[in-house]
């Protein structure tokens, strides 16, 4: 109830996320969760070797997979930007490519990824407020961003 009240006070009504995007988003976060667990001492799961690059290297998995996801999020934002018309169109297209450019020029550490995922959530808010993202979008992105950022914060290699 407190989270719902807090969200309403911010003007955000968290709606039910459709099951397919929810399932895929959770599945998409699992490599970062696994990487964080490796970085805090979980022994590698040998059965993952045939399917998961960096299956035994938490730092490599975290950095490389995190880069991929940030670039993927730029693509999602680009898709939202295609819905824009009028004065905001140039701005939202420009904002949509910012995560990909950030990855290309600046992401070298898990800390860089942490900043990137935080910034993408701010962009999620912008696109949602402009009604370019679906009504349920923040209900998906907020908990997912918290999980991903927690993995990057607590599970980053030292």
What name fits each language-model region?
Residues 14-27:
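N-terminal membrane topogenic signal
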Residues 28-32, 94-104, 140-156:
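Small-residue-rich segments of transmembrane alpha-helices in multi-pass membrane proteins
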Residues 41-56:
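Membrane-interface helix termini and inter-helical loops of multi-pass transporters
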Residues 55-86:
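Short, well-structured hydrophobic secondary-structure segments
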Residues 76-105:
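Helix-adjacent hinge/juxtasegments
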Residues 106-113, 158:
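Transmembrane helix interruption/hinge and helix-loop junction motifs
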Residues 112-116, 130-145:
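A cytosolic-side transmembrane-helix exit/cap motif
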Residues 116-128:
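Alpha-helical transmembrane segments and their membrane-interface exit regions
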